[in-house]
């Protein structure tokens, strides 16, 4: 997201913490407001339902701005994050990037890949998501449908996770063309389960997430909103200072374990996965056959072309594309 866009988003609400003068912010990718029944709960709605709430360039910075707004309001004690429409968040809005020949810090076609420009872009998004984790006020992700790929980054940066039993969570791009930059899986699941998720790119449902300890609870879909609000309201009865102190103590353990250093490595590796032979093959396949075909191959369990095989396939695809031009 461009700096000017982020500054514009931050200017949409005043810096004052006076509740009478602080207005509800307006965003292009999400909404935030206080719950009508319990104004101690701020409800942050990812609001791109026509794209399964996919992450656009504006969304990470708007999440940061919304969290900062909620933290500045003394009435708010807890932030509940949810998605409009059929699911929580389907990940980054990548179809256009994968299928088209465009110049972007995270996809450079005509010029050599600049890893530091790529890193700066993705690190900014990661830091935006991490405002949910760093927020002085507890954050709860309420997940229905799917929280996958980058959507799982948003969910796992929240302090607590409440899922519908049939909802799904996972990071499929670990098979090719991605590495979760927030690196939260190990801290939320432990090394063995995290490795299983990263090695397979599989998704799990809400029931399994609760059994594994990834989700705080999993409930039938029709009970999800009530369960999430019951938990949020229970938390909202605790003084803000106590919530902030307890959160700081737990977060400090993760900081001592190296969460920030791990995120730096994961963000570097994410850029590499998009520009190594395997990542370039994935993108060329999407450009020739469409993004849907590419992700169907990725998720099918078929071996991903690698190394020299991937390079040879890239040359073949480029030759066919040259013949059609």
Regions found by a protein language model. Give the residues of each.
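Short, active-site-adjacent cap segments at secondary-structure transitions
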Residues: 86-89, 148, 250-253
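Terminal peptide-recognition signature
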Residues: 44, 48, 62-63, 81, ...
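C-terminal alpha-helix plus adjacent terminal tail
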Residues: 7-10, 18-40, 205-206, 226, ...
């Amino acid at each position: 997201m461009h700096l000017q866009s982020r500054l514009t988003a931050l200017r949409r609400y005043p810096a004052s913490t006076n509740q009478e003068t602080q207005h509800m912010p307006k965003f292009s990718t999400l909404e935030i407001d206080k719950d009508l029944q319990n104004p101690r709960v701020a409800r942050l709605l990812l609001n791109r339902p026509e794209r399964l709430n996919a992450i656009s360039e504006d969304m990470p910075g708007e999440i940061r701005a919304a969290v900062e707004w909620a933290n500045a309001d003394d009435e708010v004690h807890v932030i509940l994050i949810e998605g409009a429409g059929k699911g929580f968040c389907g990940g980054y809005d990548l179809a256009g990037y994968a299928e088209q020949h465009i110049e972007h810090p995270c996809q450079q076609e005509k010029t050599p890949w600049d890893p530091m420009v790529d890193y700066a872009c993705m690190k900014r998004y990661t830091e935006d998501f991490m405002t949910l984790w760093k927020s002085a006020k507890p954050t709860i992700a309420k997940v229905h449908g799917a929280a996958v790929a980058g959507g799982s980054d948003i969910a796992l940066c929240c302090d607590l996770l409440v899922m519908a039993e049939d909802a799904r969570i996972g990071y499929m791009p670990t098979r090719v063309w991605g590495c979760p930059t927030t690196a939260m899986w190990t801290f939320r699941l432990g090394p063995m389960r995290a490795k299983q998720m990263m090695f397979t790119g599989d998704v799990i449902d809400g029931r399994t997430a609760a059994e594994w300890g990834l989700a705080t609870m999993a409930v039938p879909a029709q009970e999800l909103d009530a369960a999430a609000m019951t938990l949020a309201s229970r938390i909202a009865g605790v003084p803000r200072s106590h919530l902030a102190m307890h959160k700081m103590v737990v977060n400090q353990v993760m900081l001592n374990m190296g969460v920030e250093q791990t995120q730096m490595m994961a963000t570097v590796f994410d850029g590499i996965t998009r520009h190594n032979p395997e990542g370039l093959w994935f993108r060329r396949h999407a450009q020739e056959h469409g993004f849907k075909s590419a992700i169907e191959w990725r998720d099918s369990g078929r071996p991903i072309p690698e190394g020299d095989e991937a390079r040879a396939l890239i040359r073949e695809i480029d030759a066919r594309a040259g013949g059609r031009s």
